[in-house]
């Protein structure tokens, strides 16, 4: 409805607050889905997402879901060897990556790690989409790598592809600390129903309220409670890049809570 379209669905951290409405998110997702569709991505294809904690990571996840493609998010900055294992295991048709991530006191280049992972992997993706960040732009390999903004600017919005409730939504790999990483598959229907139930019955969170899971989209808590649970329940999700106990200091955690969870939406000076 019109109220939901205007509602904030994602807020990107305090001091540098970026607000994204449900309507804006839907438009961004549909455009990226159109770009993926134009590159041949279809229902059932696997797409690896190798991005930092930025709204574009959420857009990438939802764009895959919009096409019925299966996303597999790999924790941003993971070693090339670990990324290569996941490329081979899921036979990724495409990879969506960020040019870099931001950590306390440093910038982490992602593209060199991605390039090395692809060289190590036996399976080669058809193409990569790179979201270029102002902090560090990446060199693109002609014919394989494509600029996110260039593709999206030329794409038409893609409609939702119907899927069955038992169709896979995503593959998320275990850490691999006790052996070979194992890909856990979650289905579309039951997973979303259960997440919506937990928001109401575990957390007492309702539409229009603000929810912050201080995790990462590369882990299951981030999948569940940064992305899918808040969105399916109509709440506003907080997305934070960096370490909330150390970017720049341990007080950041409480500043974000004070600014975004307990401050009026009109307070633009957070």
Positions of the model-derived regions?
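Conserved AMP-binding/adenylate-forming core of the ANL superfamily
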Residues: 11-62, 79, 83-84, 140-150, ...
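N-lobe entry segment of adenylate-forming
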Residues: 3-7, 11-19, 27, 31, ...
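Conserved pre-ATP/AMP-binding loop-to-beta segment of ANL
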Residues: 128-131, 142-173, 180, 190, ...
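Conserved AMP-binding/adenylation subdomain of ANL enzymes
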Residues: 192-210, 220-261
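Single conserved hydrophobic/aromatic residue that forms the stacking wall/gate
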Residues: 1-6, 10, 262, 266-270
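Conserved adenylation A10 loop of the ANL superfamily
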Residues: 13-14, 171-183, 199, 263-267
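A short helix-loop-beta submotif of the ANL/AMP-binding
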Residues: 46, 52-80, 90-95, 209-210, ...
């Amino acid at each position: 409805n019109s109220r939901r379209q205007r509602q904030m669905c994602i807020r990107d951290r305090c001091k540098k607050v970026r607000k994204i409405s449900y309507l804006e998110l839907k438009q961004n997702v549909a455009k990226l889905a159109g770009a993926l569709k134009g590159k041949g991505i279809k229902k059932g294809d696997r797409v690896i997402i190798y991005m930092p904690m930025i709204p574009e990571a959420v857009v990438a996840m939802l764009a895959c879901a919009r096409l019925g493609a299966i996303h597999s998010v790999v924790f941003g900055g993971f070693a090339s060897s670990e990324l290569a294992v996941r490329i081979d295991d899921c036979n990724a048709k495409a990879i969506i990556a960020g040019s870099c991530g931001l950590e306390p006191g440093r910038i982490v280049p992602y593209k060199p790690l991605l390039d090395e992972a692809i060289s190590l992997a036996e399976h080669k993706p058809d193409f990569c989409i790179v979201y270029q960040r102002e902090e560090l732009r990446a060199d693109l390999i002609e014919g394989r790598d494509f600029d996110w903004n260039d593709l999206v600017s030329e794409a038409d919005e893609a409609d939702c592809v119907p899927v069955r409730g038992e169709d896979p939504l995503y593959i998320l790999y275990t850490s691999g600390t006790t052996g070979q990483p194992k890909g856990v598959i979650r289905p579309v229907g039951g997973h979303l129903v259960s997440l919506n139930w937990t928001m109401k019955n575990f957390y007492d969170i309702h539409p229009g309220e603000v929810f912050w899971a201080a995790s990462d989209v590369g882990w299951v808590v981030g999948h569940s409670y940064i992305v899918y649970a808040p969105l399916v329940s109509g709440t506003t999700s907080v997305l934070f890049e960096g370490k909330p106990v150390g970017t720049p200091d341990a007080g950041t955690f409480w500043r974000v809570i004070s600014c975004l969870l307990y401050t009026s939406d009109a307070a633009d000076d957070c």
